[in-house]
């Protein structure tokens, strides 16, 4: 019952019935999700939609048993109590309730950065060199993996978002501290080649890639603070020009579809500062909808305001 992207359009808020805005949860991204969900809820109500907040998966399960809602707008971020790992999608499928975003497979695959990379590489799509580290990897294995990839590298949890638990490593002395930080959030870790250059992201809405955004943080990189707290990060949209812009939009669509995603989402990309080559990083299947978030910024470039964006995402459940 996930959103199958088609041409269903409506101007009648009653067509949606009662809508649950799924937010909060218990993942490490709870606060971001509460912020996103509050914005979505306000936008739907402003358009006359009968929308109610539902905090987390257990509350949603109770509501579905009681048949309280006709569809779900999912802005539950992350995994382990979040809404991007396929678990809540399976719940909604079991109850036959339409919902926004990717289905079970697309959500679960995209949450696992390592599996996503394997799919992309099998299709010839570029992604940085990487290694997987199991929980409790020895210091010898950690340093060996770093040498194989070549410094500098990124160390991150394999199944987290919002730059939670992510470190940049420029010398071997920083490695074990970075691994310890990432391991707080997930058992499996991803060690990845650090691409020096432009950080870009491309939002996908239905079958359309929106204009890319080039992210220019005031600090060295786009961390949690730059994403959600600081007001000095620059967002350039479109992030590229001409053929380069067309290329990154097509790459994002290819990567999104390869991961089995649909509905809406966001694809993060690095552009090598020397060669100009594009490298896929990850897919976000329930992107942020905060004041700092990137999907609304890209939509505005096409004249789509926030309320209209939220409406169009929900329309895909009809």
Swiss-Prot record:
It is an enzyme of class 6 (ligase). Mg(2+) 1 binds at residues 268, 282. Pathway: Cell wall biogenesis; peptidoglycan biosynthesis. It catalyses: 2 D-alanine + ATP = D-alanyl-D-alanine + ADP + phosphate + H(+). It comes from Xanthomonas axonopodis pv. citri (strain 306). ATP binds at residues 146-201. One of its GO terms (cellular component) is cytosol. Its main location: cytoplasm. The keyword Magnesium applies. InterPro entries: ATP-grasp (IPR011761), ATP_grasp_subdomain_1 (IPR013815), D-Ala_lig_Van_CS (IPR000291), D_ala_D_ala (IPR005905), Dala_Dala_lig_C (IPR011095), Dala_Dala_lig_N (IPR011127), PreATP-grasp_dom_sf (IPR016185). PANTHER family: D-ALANINE--D-ALANINE LIGASE, D-ALANINE--D-ALANINE LIGASE B. Cell wall formation. This is D-alanine--D-alanine ligase. Its cofactor is Mg(2+); Mn(2+). Residues 117-315 form the ATP-grasp domain. It is found in: Cytoplasm. SUPFAM superfamilies: Glutathione synthetase ATP-binding domain-like, PreATP-grasp domain. The keyword Cytoplasm applies. It comes from the Bacteria. Binds 2 magnesium or manganese ions per subunit. Keywords: ATP-binding, Cell shape, Cell wall biogenesis/degradation, Cytoplasm, Ligase, Magnesium, Manganese, Metal-binding, Nucleotide-binding, Peptidoglycan synthesis. GO terms for biological process: cell wall organization; peptidoglycan biosynthetic process; regulation of cell shape. Pfam families: Dala_Dala_lig_C, Dala_Dala_lig_N. One of its GO terms (molecular function) is metal ion binding.
């Amino acid at each position: 019952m996930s959103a199958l992207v088609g041409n269903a359009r409506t101007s009648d808020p009653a067509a949606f019935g009662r809508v649950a805005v799924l937010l909060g949860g218990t993942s490490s991204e709870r606060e971001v999700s509460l912020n996103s969900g509050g914005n979505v809820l306000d936008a739907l109500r402003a358009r006359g939609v009968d929308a109610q907040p539902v905090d987390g998966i257990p509350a949603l399960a109770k509501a579905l048993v009681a048949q309280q809602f006709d569809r779900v707008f999912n802005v539950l971020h992350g995994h382990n109590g979040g809404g991007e790992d396929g678990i809540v999608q399976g719940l909604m499928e079991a109850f036959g309730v339409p919902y926004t975003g990717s289905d079970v497979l697309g959500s679960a695959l995209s949450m696992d950065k390592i599996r996503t990379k394997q799919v992309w590489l099998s299709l010839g799509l570029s992604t940085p060199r990487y290694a997987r580290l199991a929980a409790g990897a020895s210091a010898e294995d950690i340093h060996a993996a770093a040498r194989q990839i070549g410094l500098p590298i990124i160390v991150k949890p394999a199944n987290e978002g919002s730059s939670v638990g992510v470190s940049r490593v420029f010398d071997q002395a920083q490695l074990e501290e970075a691994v310890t930080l990432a391991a707080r959030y997930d058992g499996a870790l991803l060690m990845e080649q650090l691409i020096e250059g432009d950080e870009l992201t491309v939002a996908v809405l239905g079958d359309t890639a929106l204009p890319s955004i080039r992210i220019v943080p005031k600090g060295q990189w786009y961390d949690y603070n730059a994403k959600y707290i600081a007001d000095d990060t620059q967002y350039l949209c479109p992030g590229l020009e001409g053929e380069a812009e067309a290329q990154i939009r097509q790459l994002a669509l290819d990567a999104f579809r390869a991961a089995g995603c649909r509905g809406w989402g966001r694809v993060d990309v690095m552009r090598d500062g020397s060669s100009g080559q594009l490298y896929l990083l990850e897919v976000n299947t329930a992107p942020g909808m905060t004041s700092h978030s990137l999907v609304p910024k890209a939509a505005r470039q096409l004249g789509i305001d926030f309320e209209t964006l939220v409406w169009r995402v929900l329309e895909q459940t009809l």
